[in-house]
Amino acid sequence: MTNAKSKKEYLNRICKVQDYIEEHLHEPLSLDELSNIAGFSKFHFHRIFKAIEKETLAQYVNRLKLENATAFLIHRTDMTVTDIAHYFGFTDSAVFSRAFKNYYKISPIKYRNNYS
């Protein structure tokens, strides 16, 4: 990202990928798919994404999943924690609960009880 024009182009490409991620957050996302959307090689995409976002693609996607899961915990009381975990692509509720607690410092069940 040496000049302003290429930096703007890179930002536009990354924004396009971010929009795609947000629209497909509950679906499996692959590096191949996302790098193709950005029009970069996998290696270049991963490097540019981290340079712009200051977090890896995996960290970004996990953070978005956890942030969106909070709304589900509060407003989708018809869904169990396991249902929410599976909806956002976690392999099971234990993996989801561990990631949630690491990020929010509270378990998903306690979060739901405190805020719903």
Q: Where are the language model's segments positioned?
A:
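…primarily DNA-binding HTH/wHTH and HhH modules…
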Residues: 1-8, 12, 74, 98-116
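Glycine/alanine-rich phosphate-binding loops at beta-alpha junctions
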Residues: 1-47
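Terminal helix-turn-helix DNA-binding modules in bacterial transcription factors
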Residues: 15-32, 52-87, 115-116
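Residues within the alpha-helical elements of helix-turn-helix
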Residues: 37, 87-88
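The short coil/loop that forms the "turn" connecting the two helices of the helix-turn-helix
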Residues: 40, 90-91
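Key DNA-contact positions within bacterial/archaeal DNA-binding proteins
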Residues: 43, 93-94, 109
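Short, polar N-cap/turn motifs at the start of nucleic acid-interacting alpha helices
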Residues: 82, 92-93
